[in-house]
Amino acid sequence: MDLARDPTGAEIAKFIATRTGAQMVQLMRCIKEPAAQAAFTAKLLVASPAVSGQPATPEKARKALNAFVGFRCYYITIPMFKPWPMKKLSNLIGLLWEADPNKSLWSLMAKAWSTIRDQIGKDQAPLNQFFRIICPHLKLPDPASYLEIHGWILNVNEEGDPTISRSADSEFASIGTGNTDMTLSVEDIITYVQSLGYAHGFILDDNKPSSTFLGHSVSSTLEKNTSAISATQATSKAAHARFLVRNKRRAKRQAVRNASYRASLDQDILIAHQLDPAPVDNHVPDCYSTTAPVLNQSPNQFYDGLTTLLSDQIPTIQDDAGHLDNAHLFNDCSLPGDVSFMNIDDFTTNMPNLIDYDAFRLGADEDVTLPIFDDITQI
C-alpha cells in the first residue's frame, strides 16, 4: 500500500494551470483562512497560462510583395496621371515598367518590405512611407520627374484617353539612374529605413546570412534598357496600328448608315410627290406643272361689248346728285323685285335711252326677247 505524500510544487502548479474557471472558484471557496486565500491569489497572478495538448496551427506564410506592384504603387502618383482613373492608367504603367532599367532594385525593395511586414504587420509598416524613404536613397527618380528623366511624352488621343510615347533621343536617358555602383542587400535596406524611424518594432537577426543581394553594372543596365526600349516601341506601334484599323471600321460603318439614310429619304420624297426624282445636274423649276385645263383667253367681241354696256349704265353717286329727292334711282335697293321699272312713279335714270332690263332680273322669263343693242355690231 502506497503511503500518502504531499504533492510537489510542480504538480500543484500543473494542477492549477489545468483547472477551469468554475473549478478555480470552487477551490477559492474551500480555503477558509484569509492568509491562505491571499497566498493562493498571488500564486494565480504569476502562474503561467495553460498549454493545450494540441499543437498550434502554423500561420500561413504571406505572399511576398511583387516588384511591379511596388513600382505601380509609387509611380501611380505621377502628377500628370491625376486626371484619369486607375483603369485608364494600367496600360501606361505597364509600358513604363517594361522600359524601366531598375527592375532588380524594385525586386530587392519588395523583398525587404515583405520581410518587415511579416514580422510586425502591415499596419506598422506603411508601404508608401517605405518607398518615400528608400527611393531617394537609391537615387530613383521621384514621380514628378520620372517621365522627363526617362524621355516619356504624355499625349491624349481623340477619345480623351492618355497615351505615352518615347522621344527618339531617349535611348541613353536611363543611364545614370539608380545606384549602379553599389552592392546592396535586403538587410542594408532594412537598416537604412530603421535608422530614419521606420519599423521600430522590427528585430533584425544578425546571425542569419542575407539571402538576397544586388550588384549593379552599367553595361548590364544599358543592355537591359536598350532591349526594353525596343520592346516598348514595338508595343506602341502595334497599339497605334490597332487604333487606325478600328477607326477605319467605324468610318465604314458610318458611311453605310449615311447611305441608307439618304436612300430612305429619297424614297419618302418620291412617295410624297409621286414624281420621278429629278436629275441632280438639271435645273429644278420653282413650281411643278399641273394637269388642270387652261381656259381660252382669246378676246370675244360679243361678251366684251355686253360687259362694257352694263358697266357704263350703273350710275355713280356724283352723277345722281342732281336728281330730285323723291325720285328713285335705277340701282335703288329698296325697290321691290317684282315691280316693273316702267310702272314706278317718279323713276329717273341717267341712261340716254330707256331700255327694259326686266329680262336680266332674277327670276325673269328665260324666253323673253332680248333688247336690241344698236351700238353693238351684229356678229
From Swiss-Prot:
<dbReference type="GO" id="GO:0008301">
    <property type="term" value="F:DNA binding, bending"/>
</dbReference>
<keyword id="KW-0238">DNA-binding</keyword>
<comment type="similarity">
    <text>Belongs to the MATALPHA1 family.</text>
</comment>
<keyword id="KW-0539">Nucleus</keyword>
<dbReference type="GO" id="GO:0005634">
    <property type="term" value="C:nucleus"/>
</dbReference>
<dbReference type="InterPro" id="IPR006856">
    <property type="entry name" value="MATalpha_HMGbox"/>
</dbReference>
<dbReference type="Pfam" id="PF04769">
    <property type="entry name" value="MATalpha_HMGbox"/>
</dbReference>
<keyword id="KW-0805">Transcription regulation</keyword>
<protein>
    <recommendedName>
        <fullName>Mating-type protein MAT-1</fullName>
    </recommendedName>
</protein>
<dbReference type="GO" id="GO:0045895">
    <property type="term" value="P:positive regulation of mating-type specific transcription, DNA-templated"/>
</dbReference>
<comment type="function">
    <text>Mating type proteins are sequence specific DNA-binding proteins that act as master switches in fungal differentiation by controlling gene expression in a cell type-specific fashion. Transcriptional activator that induces the transcription of alpha-specific genes.</text>
</comment>
<keyword id="KW-0278">Fertilization</keyword>
<keyword id="KW-0804">Transcription</keyword>
<dbReference type="GO" id="GO:0007338">
    <property type="term" value="P:single fertilization"/>
</dbReference>
<feature type="DNA-binding region" description="Alpha box">
    <location>
        <begin position="60"/>
        <end position="117"/>
    </location>
</feature>
